[in-house]
Amino acid sequence: MCSSIPSLREVFANDFRIGAAVNPVTLEAQQSLLIRHVNSLTAENHMKFEHLQPEEGRFTFDIAIKSSTSPFSSHGVRGHTLVWHNQTPSWVFQDSQGHFVGRDVLLERMKSHISTVVQRYKGKVYCWDVINEAVADEGSEWLRSSTWRQIIGDDFIQQAFLYAHEADPEALLFYNDYNECFPEKREKIYTLVKSLRDKGIPIHGIGMQAHWSLNRPTLDEIRAAIERYASLGVILHITELDISMFEFDDHRKDLAAPTNEMVERQAERYEQIFSLFKEYRDVIQNVTFWGIADDHTWLDHFPVQGRKNWPLLFDEQHNPKPAFWRVVNI
């Protein structure tokens, strides 16, 4: 079946790269899908700080590097992520007595990590999510409260971009976030990136995570976000796309399979979204799914632990869903 259906990466070859998030299990279990349908890979977790440098000075590149070796040697890699408030080991922020370090020490640790990691993958990783999810979700606060910000100050963001650019001047550098289409947060992200661009900080793009549902955000909200971000003169990547069968506040656990209505609505939704992406292909250069098939999705564990979800284009048996056919036939 896999070789007899259209290839996503070939269908959209003149529009944008097609990518998928992977881990050591899915690189094996979903290998045929990944080889045929995508030309960009993102490590789901294994390029995050806690995996690459669990202890100071001890780097563990062995697992992360698998995505850049045969049979995926022709696939580009999106680096994800260098600085984030989650999945960062406590030693990064503490001294030997368990007390918070000062600004200078933390900046040096940040620089050391970014320089080592970015230089290690130079030439293979074509872009990096340098900063992930630093903007506050709601309220008057502009930036999220985090230990990075608490110790260094608001300029921890610009410093990270400067360090990454120094380590690999050819790599494209991104700010990446979720809820990126809702107006309140959209404007905060816009303001952050504009402030960096105005200072001459090397930031080349915005990553729109695109963890969306059957109804939210609206197409008008998605379009408005794309146009607002594009007005800054930056590249846009769709970095973590999936379409949940459930709204975020829907916590039901009674479905063993999606209803026919859900499947049809998801197909319609994917068709509408990809039609929109194609309309803006001059600024959208990559569309990456957070997975490739429904047998492995983070949404099985969030926001409801242990509830099965079906957010991707291929089902649990790796067969194309109605959404797949709607997308490739746009």
UniProtKB/Swiss-Prot annotation:
Any one Pfam family match given in the protein's UniProt record, by short name: Glyco_hydro_10
Residue intervals of the GH10 domain: 2-330
Catalytic reaction equation(s): Endohydrolysis of (1->4)-beta-D-xylosidic linkages in xylans
InterPro entries the UniProt entry points to: GH10, GH10_AS, GH10_dom, Glycoside_hydrolase_SF
GO BP: xylan catabolic process
Keywords per UniProt: Carbohydrate metabolism, Cytoplasm, Glycosidase, Hydrolase, Polysaccharide degradation, Xylan degradation
Active site per UniProt: E133, E240
GO cellular component term of the entry, any: cytoplasm
Induction: By xylan and xylose.
Name of this protein: Endo-1,4-beta-xylanase
